């Protein structure tokens, strides 16, 4: 997995020690590409679903890039999870350019197999697809990797969703004291971890 690090300085912010980083893109690129990411099906025990919704993570990554406009699941006319279930007429009617479907299957204790397929809706053909073994711990990272593959396949540029970011938080403690922390997190702000805690300014990772 890629491990590129970026610095985000939270200047003047007062964050709780356990607060999560929220990354919000308020304006996407003009002409963002319409895409549908169908919620991934779970092929295992309904009472023991995977810890993360892979399709939701993929859609959120693509939306956050500003290059794509994912269709809301509520607007979908169907929710195929296998190639033979795809009726491209449904997606053409919704003016969707590309379609992502997939499923998750159990693979031994704590393991999963994630399969996904990317389609060109107007050509009515599969562009790419992968079967990816993973674990419960790495399932969200696998979803980011899927988003990277989709992004690069459709734009020709490498995705950065599976990278990590580094950022600094500042929390005031008392009148003249300040607690400063260097943290790392997933590119979407998930799973933050404190690397350094100090009462002195931290300007870089």
Language model features by range: what are they?
Residues 4-13:
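Sec-dependent N-terminal signal peptides
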Residues 101, 165-170:
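Residue position within the beta-strands of beta-propeller blades
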Residues 138-139, 153-156, 199-205:
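Conserved beta-propeller blade repeats
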Residues 15-19:
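Sec/Tat signal peptide C-region and signal peptidase I cleavage site
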Residues 186-203:
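Multi-bladed beta-propeller domains
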Residues 21, 82-149:
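Amphipathic beta-strand/beta-sheet edge segments enriched in Tyr/Trp
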Residues 24-89, 100, 104-106:
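Short beta-strand->alpha-helix linker/helix-N-cap micro-motif
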Residues 109-113, 174-183:
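Structural motif
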């Amino acid at each position: 997995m890629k491990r590129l690090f970026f610095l985000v300085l939270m200047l003047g912010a007062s964050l709780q020690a356990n607060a999560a980083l929220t990354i919000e893109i308020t304006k996407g690129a003009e002409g963002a590409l319409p895409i549908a990411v169908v919620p991934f099906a779970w092929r295992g025990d309904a009472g023991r679903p995977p810890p993360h919704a892979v399709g939701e993570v993929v859609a959120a990554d693509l939306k956050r890039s500003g290059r794509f406009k994912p269709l809301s699941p509520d607007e979908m006319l169907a929710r195929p999870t296998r190639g033979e279930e795809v009726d491209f007429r449904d997606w053409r009617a919704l003016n969707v350019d590309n379609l992502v479907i997939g499923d998750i299957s159990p693979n031994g204790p704590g393991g999963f197999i994630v399969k996904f397929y990317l389609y060109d809706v107007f050509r009515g053909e599969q562009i790419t697809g992968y079967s990816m073994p993973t674990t419960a711990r790495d399932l969200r990272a696998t979803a980011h990797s899927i988003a990277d593959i989709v992004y690069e396949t459709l734009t020709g540029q490498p995705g950065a969703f599976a990278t990590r970011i580094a950022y600094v938080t500042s929390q005031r403690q008392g009148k003249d004291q300040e607690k400063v922390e260097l943290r790392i997190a997933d590119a979407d702000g998930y799973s933050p971890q404190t690397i350094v805690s100090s009462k002195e300014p931290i300007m870089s990772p």
